[in-house]
UniProtKB/Swiss-Prot annotation:
Keywords noted in UniProt: Amino-acid biosynthesis, Cytoplasm, Histidine biosynthesis, Lyase
Coiled-coil stretches: none
The UniProt record lists the keyword Metal-binding: no
Entry protein name: Imidazoleglycerol-phosphate dehydratase
Record's subcellular location: Cytoplasm
Disulfide bonds: none
Enzyme class: lyase
GO biological process, one term: L-histidine biosynthetic process
Length: 194
């Protein structure tokens, strides 16, 4: 089974995270940031991943360090769980509607970290979650995992729906990218490595 666990502790946060790419039944998320817990749960459910997250952070300041550090650890676990990347699709993309909103995510498990994030989030806060942290989370994942990630909110009016569409699209796109493909021998690159 492709899986990896990591504990990362700093003066600001303590993150314990386990990711299972091939087993999506066990999902448990506790970060101390309710909206973020909801989004991570949606990501795992729609990507059919197993995900267990326990996070303690300086949320008395704000949720920034917790959200960013969870993204770093998730990216690290993804990179390690993929091992040598042999036989995977490598690319994945998904459009996901959430009522009036439409989100799009495209992923390349390229070994090169890059992110493009486009979207207007008009409501600055949802519960104790600063909505600008959405981009920070995706940036942290992309850099830690060494993947190229494009995330775009095409349209919508409800900020919750916009972010939810992105997290669901992220799960579905990542599922497609990490899926093993019997038609691919070795790594899916003319270079012979990713």
């Amino acid at each position: 089974m492709r899986e990896f666990s990591q504990i990362r502790e700093t003066t600001e946060t303590k993150i314990k995270l386990s990711l299972q790419l091939d087993e999506g039944k066990n999902v448990s998320v506790q970060t101390g940031v309710g909206f973020f817990d909801h989004m991570l749960t949606l990501f795992a459910r729609h990507g059919r991943f197993g995900l267990q997250v326990e996070a303690e952070g300086d949320v008395f300041v704000d949720a920034h360090h917790t959200v960013e550090d969870v993204g770093i650890v998730l990216g690290n676990c993804l990179k390690e769980a993929l091992q040598n990347k042999e036989g995977i699709n490598r690319y994945g993309s998904a459009y996901v509607p959430m009522d009036e909103s439409l989100g799009f995510v495209a992923i390349d498990i390229s070994g090169r970290s890059y992110i493009v994030f486009q979207g207007e989030l008009t409501n600055p806060k949802l519960g104790d979650f600063d909505t600008e942290l959405t981009e920070e989370f995706f940036r942290a994942v992309a850099h830690a995992a060494n993947i190229t990630l494009h995330a775009r909110i095409l349209y919508g009016s409800n900020t919750h729906h916009k972010i939810e569409a992105l997290f669901k699209a992220f799960g579905r796109a990542l599922r497609e990218a990490v899926e093993r493909n019997a038609h691919i021998t070795g790594v899916n690159s003319t270079k012979g490595m990713l």
